[in-house]
Regions:
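Acidic (Asp/Glu)-rich catalytic clusters
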Residues: 25-38, 69-73, 100-102, 124-133
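Active-site beta-loop-alpha junctions enriched in small/polar residues
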Residues: 8-10, 42-46, 82-85, 112-118, ...
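Short, acidic/polar
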Residues: 1, 55-72, 120-124
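Beta/alpha (TIM)-barrel catalytic core signal, keyed to glycine-rich beta->alpha loops juxtaposed to Asp/Glu
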Residues: 89-162
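N-terminal binding-site loop/beta-alpha segment at the start of enzyme catalytic domains
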Residues: 1-37, 103
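Conserved, mostly hydrophobic/aromatic
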Residues: 5, 22, 39, 68, ...
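Active-site mouth loops of central-metabolism enzymes
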Residues: 47-62, 83-89
Length: 162
């Protein structure tokens, strides 16, 4: 059966609507299985207007996670991903926000999505120094795009069919 649910703060026809719908289904049908489920969410794309409604600042990531948890009716997610590299925010700030999510109990593990190999390696080192459980790398992967094979990390793919 299906045990992993991969969500993001901006998924759905309206940003956040996928999490709202998932939260309703979890409450009505799947709640008794919560301990058997892997629920993940991501933040990194635009959610609201203003300087902190996008990318990878500490303020944006932690506010987005709080909003995601509220929409889904959860106290924590199993994996919280940063959805894409941020060219403006220092990597240490972004990784620090992910580590804070784990330290606060709002995420059990962290993941990264859409990071290039060099930045991914740097981020993994920072997270390791912070003793933050970085467990997965989510990138595009297909027969035509195998660039993530060489990073030595566990991975999950999106768009496996071209």
């Amino acid at each position: 059966g299906i045990t992993q649910f991969d969500l993001a703060n901006n998924y759905g026809p309206e940003p956040g609507s996928a999490e709202i719908n998932f939260g309703r289904i979890l409450k009505e049908d799947l709640g008794k299985y919560r301990d058997e489920l892997i629920i993940t969410t991501k933040a990194g794309y635009e959610m609201w207007d203003g300087p902190y409604g996008n990318w990878g600042s500490r303020k944006y990531l932690l506010a987005s996670l709080d909003q995601s948890l509220k929409r889904m009716g959860l106290e924590y997610v199993d994996i919280f991903y940063h959805h894409r590299m941020d060219p403006e925010t220092p990597l240490e700030e972004t990784m620090g926000a992910l580590a804070s999510a784990v330290q606060s109990g709002k995420a059990l593990y962290v993941g990264l999505s859409n990071y290039d190999g060099k930045t991914l390696s740097q981020a993994a080192s920072i997270l390791q120094e912070m003793h933050c459980p970085f467990v997965i790398n989510q990138n595009r992967y297909s027969i035509f795009d195998r660039t993530v094979e060489n990073n030595g990390l566990k991975k999950t793919a999106y768009r496996p069919l071209p």
